[in-house]
Amino acid sequence: MSSMVNRKMRLAGWFVLASGLLLGQTPEAPKYTGPGSCASPSCHGGVQVRTETSVQQNEYSTWVVQDKHAHAFAVLTNPVATRMARILKIEKADAAPKCLACHALSVPEAERARTFDSTDGVSCESCHGPASNWLGSHTTKVWTHERSVAAGMRDLRDPIRRSENCLGCHLGNADKAVDHEMIAAGHPDLYFELASFTAAMPRHWKERLDDPQIEVRMLASAQAVQLREQLLRVARNTQGNSWPEFADLDCFACHHNLTNSENSWRQELGYVGRKAGSPPWNLSRYAVLRQIVNDVDRDGGRRLETEIERLYGIMSSANADRSQAAVQARTTSETAGRLAQQIATASFDPARTQRLLQAIAHDGDYISRQGERAAEQAAMSLQSLYLAYASQARSANDTQIRAALKTLFQRVENPSAYNAPKFAEAMRSLSQVLP
């Protein structure tokens, strides 16, 4: 009951703030106002989708009722989080900065409006940016998206900007990190594929009908951005107290069943590029990207491949050299960043999407050997690519393709029991029915 009263009191404050902004009382610096500033039924708090407006106007309602982001703070008090806090010697997870960094909108006090409340979880401004400078004015008929961006709204129509925003928590950055200690305490390992994760969200936005290529461009750009961010994470981790940081490595190279060594596919295939017993660097964020890059910029793809192989050799050594890893990771991150810019402006028509589907599916032997996380990345990407392709071009094999995609996901259901040859076989089956 008290929670509902607090929400209503904050809502009243939000209306006062918005009214002031409409009168031109803009703060000197942008501030975070909280999700209630969007919650009016005439703004984003409606129940029904409105078709005659540029937005659905039920965005807040969708988020607060259906979206897991709205409950990100609340999970910090559940039994799993409580146990994690005990293991990590944290008094309370819902008060710990390392937890609040991603389970709430964690911003400095100076950037919070009086209506701000961190218990709202991962809310509107976590993605769209501090609203104080455009909150009131963006409701006028003459206002445009571009003017909102100029006033401080994050441009989530930009593939790179959207990817960076999501990856801040779904991979980490200089201020947010999930390390091996946190994973051992019970936090899930982090993985991400933009198109799949977006599709899993309750949709609170209108489709971009003016750009039918946007879904594939977003997916492809995000692959490059997440590799860049992974490389920057490696460079940061070389400066840490613990080295190597095991969260940078392939978890399931160690965390798998060891009882049937006579049937071990790992021993059968061998340990290319490393010694047996040396955990390999996690290549899942490169495994799919390499085919995208080769299609957009073949020379850039070759350069990236050379640099990745060099870093893989350093990182997959039992005594990985910190300084060598730092230099190579930074160099390769710059290469990945340049390629991300190219990909973000490239054309992704049905013909290119079809080529990517075939190229990734035919790369099953390589992808499968990079471990379960790489296989999972391929399954998610292939499904997203096919759904985007099917929305623009009909396939006579639609039923068979969807069945083959389902098999890919079945092969990665149990990460510790992952079998590379079986996943490679499933990829070959998919390649045979793709258009």
Regions found by a protein language model. Name each.
Residues W14-G24:
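Hydrophobic h-region of N-terminal signal peptides that target proteins for export
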Residues V47-R86, A113-V122, S126, P130-A375:
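Primarily the internal scaffold of c-type cytochrome electron-transfer domains
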